[in-house]
Amino acid sequence: MLARYVTVLLVWLVGAVVAPAPPTPLPAAIDHAIQQVTVAELREHISVLASDRLAGRGLGHDGNKEAETYIAGVLREAKVIQAAPDYLQRVDVYSPRLGPAARVSISDAGKPIVELRVGPEFLPQPESSDAVANGPLLFVQHGVSAPSLGHDDYTNIDAKGAVVLALDGAPDVLLRSPQLSADDKADFAAIDRKAEDARAHGAAGLIVIRNYVGDAEGTWPSRPSVRSASFRLYGPMHDKPLAVAVISEHAIKPVRAALEQRRALTASLNPDVIAQPMAMSNILGMVEGGSKTAEIVVVGAHLDHDGIDEAGRIYNGADDNASGAAAVLAIAAAFTRAAAQGVRPARAVVFALWNGEEKGSLGAEYYVAHPQPSRRIVANVNLDMVGRDEDIPDPNDPRYRGFAKTHASDNVNVVHLLGYTYAPDLARAADVANQTIQLTVKQDYDRDSQNLVRRSDHWPFLQHGIPAVFLTTGLHPDYHTPDDDTGRIDFAKLERITEFAARLVWLAADGDAPRFRTQ
């Protein structure tokens, strides 16, 4: 009898230990406002943003401007406070185009040993400014300067005014370093990083040696569609001009031989990159906070998509990312309803609809450097593709390479949270926010070989040491195709994810400031 009693008591005690904690209550007004988010509201926003009339919201197209106007109008109608004049944060960008005069000449004692125009052996890069570089040619190994990691290819090299010649990829010593993540190693191999280091050392030009230069039409389409056009932010390339190009291993052979003989070579690099200016806008609303309103939490989603391709097909981008934009608009309306009843989080919350994500997170990158309002950003929650079920039928498809095969039927309740290795406090807050919603929140993509953690608008925040997480339901066969349409959205799931994200944003804005974990 005693033994049986003890057993029952132990079972009861163990059950008491492992029983889940009750959901953390939110103030009644915000809890009620969040529960008022409806499928109808989300459907209305996506039906407009992903309509053929907006033609895929591609940057540089009228449909993109119409999306900006629609979103600002929704915020205005919901009485969301403006975080920028008329909700619009202007962002100046440019589209680089290749001119006809691009060339490179490398000389030994005044005699050209390499002379090339655009072709399979030589190609200027979109990272280039339009400045012509003339100066001594200096070989700088991989062109990576990382003295804090014990490696600097510029040691004892005066690169001021020179054209530097660099190997492709990253130095072996950094690739083998246990201190560096796979993401860090990829950074050191990128041409943007080599250009940054070349500019920091005063170089006038950078030529990177590659096995395969690339297709000129692929890099510089003669008649770019909305989908293929590239855009960039004004910045270092114009403040400190640097000519940038790639050259083939084959073409550089005479130069290698001369450098091995320690001959003094000179180079003339004319990238002939023409910057065509354009303006776009981030759309910004906000609610003021309470005791910590000098700090802001940003919840955002990108409004743009791929536009129209060369064949005239429209990429409506219902999941990517009208779904995330609709969620942020619904969250903005919910927080504004609560604020109207006097219920606000401690910190201000900015509701951001970013532009230019498909061209490299241009709007988010600009905002991190120029926040509106000008306050300290303590956290970011990003929503990108939150309206479907992850479905990866063929891991060998280039779009999915590095991901495991999975079927939509196995992911009906799944949402992925990325950024957890950088923002563990936000990841824990997500667990709390999910107690009420009961989604299956997976944290398994921060280290995938596709670098998914870098491929959306939270990444500029993480790059600046700001805790950020990325919510997504994952990839599927309609990703970046004309078949990503409104009819394929799971609106009931999107509604739950919107409520989950809203609760997470409240917890981030009302609790202790989340910490950033350096990798």
Predicted regions and their residues:
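A conserved hydrophobic secondary-structure block that centers on an alpha-helix together
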Residues: Q141-G218, A294
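Metal-dependent peptidase/peptidase-like ectodomains
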Residues: E115, T155, L242-P254, L259-E260, ...
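Short helix-loop-beta-strand segments that form the rim/entrance of peptidase-like active sites
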Residues: A330-G360, R375, L383
